[in-house]
């Protein structure tokens, strides 16, 4: 599959493919092309496509995450929505909330009760997106755990942290401070049939395959996008 656009276009393609392991070649014609293999300014696009068809490009296997969102209907029954992401799951304060309060646990171990604008749980791929803007680290794409980053927490003690690939991150909304959070998966807001009670995030069942020119492409992209360094190809 070939995408023409930015990272958002590539994320939509992964979603349309339902995160099946079909190689995706991203060609950057958008605002940000961090996940794409090349742009017209860097390489001859026809040559890039030719390299892909001849099997000369590197296949980068990217871990995904699965989020189970539990909501409670007005009649007390519960609804569960499962969604997958290549980048991240973001739980944020909704338009009618001044902040959200929640408990966060990792594989049953309580980490903290936080108040603030929310939390981002991302893959290594998503570490250069919303998670980075919230203060998280840039993580090599071959890392298969998750990155958890509080968003504008009302404490200086809250810190971003990494999990192992087998961990499950659970977020429980506080009963002491009821709020209506917004939940976005790869930037797409999820509609729930009730009030959100909890979200459980774990590694997804499959990976997304991105085509690029090798592992060094990631670090070249980091220096180009975030530090403004140009690389001669």
What are these regions (language model features)?
Residues 8-14, 128-133:
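Short glycine/serine/threonine-rich phosphate/pyrophosphate-binding segments
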Residues 12-30, 34:
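Gly/Ser-rich helix-loop-strand patches that form or flank binding pockets
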Residues 31-117:
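Catalytic core of DAGKc-family lipid kinases
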Residues 61-65, 85-87, 98-102, 117-119, ...:
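A generic structural signal for short beta-strands and their flanking turns/coil linkers
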Residues 72, 83, 91, 107-110, ...:
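ATP/nucleoside-binding phosphotransfer catalytic cores, i.e., glycine-rich phosphate-binding loops
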Residues 104, 126, 183:
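Short aromatic-centered micro-motifs
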Residues 109-157:
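Gly/Ser/Thr-rich active-site loops/lids in small-molecule metabolic enzymes
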